[in-house]
């Protein structure tokens, strides 16, 4: 059955056409919350821009929804927490609008400093007032950038080209990265005091709402100007209005407001009437090239999720560059199968998960691997949908302690993942590695060396290493028409405990497992595991 995609805001035809190649696409712009809530239950994917609000109420009605795509950067119109709780990917198109928004930032800044809108209006009125509109140049000024994401970084590059001294405030940027960009990192208060121009490039969150309030604005020079092409709520507009009216700030250029369009009586509306303020109607991403790129980018991300692949721009997952994802993908498959194995091999309530990443894999991003393991561990035990998005939250909600460890020193393998699960009854472990040209393999079960492809059905026999067990087990399986594809025994010493792994073409029924447990007095226990279908040779999300 073809996937169904609902597009609830205008989207460039390039993106729509790409979606139509593999999915049934419905375009319904300007839906109310009630209308969207009524429709959403029939769709696998939803694509919006900034106009449509995807609320918790809508998401709770989305029985089939796998992904919400935002054709742009900001996702404050989407209840990301609600989507995450239900295991719905939220993806955006961050790279598509970077250039357009950064360019618009400088368009506003230059227009503000050179008083271009006011001069143009004067000319339209038949005047030619050269001396009235003397402005300021950029070169030699200091610009303070709040937020060094994609757009903030691009603004920094443009600022350097204009001959500006660049300050920046971002808690996630290292000093080394700042030096590479040729900028100076500052705390917010210091940046506000020193900058001639302050420009905002952070998302609107609980932490950033009214980040620039009355206190923060009071730190700025009276000759300074403010530019905001991010989100209106980041700036306290009442405080901004007062600062501008009282001459404590020279001017502001705004592409975003708290109320869009401005509502009468609000600070948003009053700001539009000030002579030292320039306002554009949220045009940062409104370049034809940017819209086409955003449509294509979000369409590709949505299709990646629908075909079971891993999106690279999910906002409710750690961002993973494409090259890193390519390197991690086989280990993600391995981690997911290891979790799936321990979910069935362990008995009792899971209390703790310990993941040890050793060798080369220890130098890479671990969170996607941990998410993959938790997905495999919980998806067969829980009634709700478990995926990469909600697996950590589901583990936390159940009080499962997750511990990650890294060991960079070499092991017997280039990279090794060791997973240990502790329940209220027992502790079990499994280790896995990825081999070039072969793929993922389990290499240890409870410390016993094995070499098992984590695919299909497996019967695990815990035993004392004695003669005759393989024959008894093989005979019983044959008598019950269970074909053995592969068999291996892992042991530490002759005559000691051992584990036998038997890969079978079809699962054994419960009554046969019971017979196997009593087939020999040296058999300690018998358990069965469904690893899942064969792994793809490349690509695809576990």
Show which residues each predicted segment covers.
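Oxidoreductase and adenylate-handling cofactor-binding alpha/beta cores
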Residues: 102-121, 141, 157-164, 243, ...
